[in-house]
Amino acid sequence: MEKSEIQERVIKVVCQVLNIDKEMVSLDSNFVFDLGAESTQSVQLVGAFEEEFGIEMESEAALSVQTVGDAVDFIAKYIK
């Protein structure tokens, strides 16, 4: 899967979970500080990424994912 496709799908998931417009999201967007994700939404994001891409994100690794770009990079490593 191309990284651009991963990026599109990550942004789609972020918009659905956080109920925000695509225009608000960039690779540099921090889930908490820029997009306003609360702790429960952060957990929902991890679950949504796991479901969307068929991967499992361990707790420690999931905590290292702070931005949309981090999520894209993390997922790209798992589905090569």
Regions flagged by a language model, labelled:
Residues 1-23, 76-79:
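Thiotemplate assembly-line natural product biosynthesis machinery
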Residues 11, 28, 46:
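Generic structural marker for isolated residues within well-ordered, non-membrane alpha-helices
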Residues 17-36, 52-64:
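Phosphopantetheine carrier-protein modules
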Residues 36-48, 68:
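Amphipathic alpha-helical interaction surfaces in cytosolic regulatory modules
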Residues 63-64, 69-78:
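C-terminal structural segments of small proteins and small subunits
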